[in-house]
Curated annotation (Swiss-Prot):
Pfam families: ABC_tran (PF00005). CDD domains: ABC_cobalt_CbiO_domain1. The lineage of its organism: Archaea, Methanobacteriati, Methanobacteriota, Stenosarchaea group, Methanomicrobia. It is a peripheral membrane protein. Probably part of an ABC transporter complex. Responsible for energy coupling to the transport system. Disulfide bonds: none annotated. SUPFAM superfamilies: P-loop containing nucleoside triphosphate hydrolases. One of its GO terms (molecular function) is ATPase-coupled transmembrane transporter activity. The keyword Membrane applies. InterPro entries: AAA+_ATPase, ABC_transporter-like_ATP-bd, ABC_transporter-like_CS, ABC_transpr_CbiO/EcfA_su, ECF_ABC_transporter_ATP-bd, P-loop_NTPase. This is Putative ABC transporter ATP-binding protein MM_2387.
Length: 498
């Protein structure tokens, strides 16, 4: 189906190749899993197999790539290739350009010239499969990250292409949604579709995979069966080596840093937050869980003034967020967005970090020291002059964190902090958060990653339908342990927990 022969690729302004001498054959009906560390070349390989490198991005390409025994360069661009290959990008938001969810799905179908009856059949089918029927009239920009991924997946599935490429396409989905995607992919494989899954965490799909390709620094390090990969994964450098945290039952008296009373937020007629109350104390490390669309991101956007309450009150460090300018709030609160690309717009890595510092009056040598420290903390030292868009998704995630911690806000909020990071990098990120907590920072993390919740969180808040439905607060250590155990048991039973 797809064959790469001695393929090497270098982005236009890059000095080092992102792919080196790749030789790979993907058979018709195969489900191929591609994994590796951040910046290993996974996304670049996916873009190559979709024809996007050759027909859209350009750069230096050596070697050959063929699709169905035809050189990729012979196709009439993406217009022709997209009839055979569908791809869900690691940044689902970049695929969503229409005013409603329904229009996102209809646009591709209408461009294919299907009859009205067939269009409606496919629309209804993928909306049911991806469980987004209730979002039909919603504007994509109002959706959560996980909901956006569902819409991008639905729009791609509706086209029923021979090849489906998923690049970190489940990274922001809750447990139940990932389970649903697994079922859909299993059915597509039985229908002899060719499926390529690119992800740091492929464990959820090993059961239906045929082969695992392990990339390292742009080269194929190994190709294994799923069984062989699973057998050795605990001994590879992809696996986190951290020990689990010990829960402390003792807490010093902590002062409230966040106080929320009767908070309601609406998108049109939809209540994203519903009369919510919450208090966060100084020095806590809190995990916020919930299904896609439960209100997690909407909640944290109120803490730095990106959203103002529809009704109710939000106070941060005694400041009413409805009355305090954003440039004052960011001195106290740093928010790392769910999608790091929404934070990155400068020409170099160091300029990205400098931007926030300059906005709060930190310049000169003081800014230089802060930039150097933050980049070293996130393992990006040496990339100061790199164009941020040339970084991998995981590196961009770390850069976004560097931009926030450089300003040293007391409250650090991370919306899906481990998206795009492999297990080792995820652990390194959380060790950094623990270090910052010990320095006196308060940490809030919105996450679906139950392992980091189990290993690092002191308090767990679970949301559903814009409300807080569980909170292991008030220093109840035994209650907290039971809460974690309950969450794990529900996950094992197939419940929609996160």
């Amino acid at each position: 189906m797809i064959e790469l022969r001695n393929l090497s690729y270098t982005y236009g302004t890059a000095e080092e190749p992102s792919l080196k001498n790749i030789n790979l054959k993907v058979k018709k009906g195969e489900l191929l899993l591609v994994t590796g560390h951040s910046a290993a070349g996974k996304t670049t390989l996916a873009l190559a197999m979709a024809g996007i490198l050759h027909h859209e991005i350009g750069g230096k390409i050596e070697g050959n790539l063929s699709f169905k025994n035809r050189d990729i360069k012979e196709f009439d661009g993406i217009k022709e290739l997209s009839r055979h290959t569908g791809m869900v990008f690691d940044d689902a938001e970049s695929q969503l350009i229409f005013t409603t969810v329904e229009e996102e799905i209809l646009s591709g179908l209408e461009n294919r010239g299907y009859s009205g009856k067939e269009i409606q059949r496919r629309l209804n089918e993928v909306m049911e499969l991806c469980e987004i029927g209730h979002l039909k009239e919603r504007a994509p920009h109002t959706l959560s990250g996980g909901q956006k991924q569902k819409v991008a997946l639905a729009a791609t599935l509706a086209l029923d292409t021979e090849v489906l490429i998923l690049d970190e396409a489940t990274a922001e989905l809750d447990t139940e949604a990932v389970r649903k995607v697994f079922s859909v992919l299993k059915r597509l494989k039985e229908a002899e579709k060719t499926i390529i899954i690119v992800d740091h965490n492929i464990e959820d799909f090993l059961e239906i995979g045929d082969r695992v390709v392990l990339l390292e620094k742009g080269e194929i390090k190994a190709i294994k069966s799923p069984a062989d990969f699973a057998a050795v994964s605990e001994d590879t450098d992809l696996t986190s080596k951290s020990s689990k945290k010990e829960y402390s039952c003792s807490q010093k008296e902590r002062q409230p840093v966040i106080s929320i009373k009767n908070l309601t937020q609406r998108y049109g007629e939809f209540n994203a937050l519903d009369n919510l109350d919450l208090e966060i104390r100084s020095g806590e490390l809190v995990a916020i869980l919930g299904e896609n669309g439960s209100g997690k991101t909407t909640l944290v956007k109120h803490l730095n003034g990106l959203l103002r309450p529809y009704s109710g009150n939000v106070s941060v460090k005694g400041l009413n967020t409805s009355l305090t300018p954003v440039n004052e709030l960011v001195k106290h609160t740093g928010l790392v967005f769910q999608n790091p690309d929404n934070m990155l717009f400068e020409d170099t890595v160091e300029a990205e970090v400098a931007f926030g510092l300059n906005n709060i009056g930190i310049t000169g040598s003081e800014a230089g020291d802060a930039i150097a420290r933050s980049l070293e903390l996130v393992n990006l030292k040496g990339k100061e002059k790199v164009f941020p868009r040339h970084l991998s998704r995981g590196e961009r995630q770390r850069l976004a964190v560097a931009c926030v911690i450089a300003m040293r806000p007391e409250l650090i909020i991370l919306d899906e902090p481990t998206t795009g990071l492999d297990a080792e990098e995820s652990d390194r990120m959380m060790q950094l958060m623990k270090r910052l907590q010990l320095e006196g920072h308060t940490i809030l993390m919105v996450t679906h990653n139950m392992q980091i919740v189990k290993d690092h969180a002191e308090r767990v808040i679970r949301m559903a339908s814009g409300k807080i439905v569980e909170d292991s607060a008030n220093g109840a250590c035994n209650s907290f342990k039971r809460n974690i155990k309950c969450v794990e048991e529900k996950c094992a039973e197939g419940g929609a927990i996160v």
